[in-house]
């Protein structure tokens, strides 16, 4: 029998809004073929951020879904697997119960990653995409901002070195849950939300006051919504936007309340509730870091899981580069406290 020339790997992400699986065949980090993708929407984040626990009914739903994913993995002959959970599971008071139930019913061991590791995993995938577009951060600065349902990760890269990394608990769903429905519908919501967000941005403003930043790189759950509102291709791997275009959209949204947003942009109420937090957070970040061009990438956390599994295993130079990069961040943190 002819020996297989590739390995089959499955990455599973238990996110705040989606439980996703991606199965690939790979030889090395440059020869990867996606053979299956599954995405199932859940309200995991809303439950955790509001009630601090994952209800039993949702635990059962998650286990049933993962049993289905496990059957698919068996059908595709998956040899390697990584299952990782982020904010919603990380903050659930009954996290251990969920992980035990998943293991008992599926045999899958779930790794719950902390926020710095979550942001770094996503960053590696984004950086790889930017390099493929000829954007490497050499001789200039880039600020990467990843906004998820439960958190905001900010990474400043200058001359291909990580110079600053900070994480904030101000994700989109978390922000939405901080205001009730009546507050979100009011015309004063913009002002209240701006003040709410600005109060957390002081450390970033101070750390980046002398930074020379050419590109603002945006990623995260709601970037597809932003592209849709701008009338741009939501399926593009990389999208470049002039800062003026974004500010025009911000000025338009700034004058609207929730019912008006639904009417103007022809979107569902559940989606419209995320528009103001998303737009206002982006606008506040852009005010912190004046830049002429914004780049949006479609990379997800699951892409980072895949890259960090395959890359170091198949490419020694890439493994060494990751180590060097992590050391640059450690050295920078050390200098900050000296």
Feature-to-residue mapping (PLM):
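N-terminal glycine-rich anion-binding loops that anchor highly charged ligand groups
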Residues: 32-42, 76
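Entry/capping segment at the start of metal-dependent catalytic domains
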Residues: 1-11
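Short glycine-aspartate micro-motif
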Residues: 9-13, 142-146
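Short beta-strand scaffold segments in enzyme catalytic cores
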Residues: 19-24, 152-156, 305-306
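Helical "lid/coupling" subdomains associated with nucleotide-phosphate turnover
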Residues: 9, 43, 47-71, 75-76, ...
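Active-site neighborhood of HAD-like aspartate-dependent phosphohydrolases
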Residues: 10, 23-26
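Beta-strand initiation motifs
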Residues: 29-35, 161-166
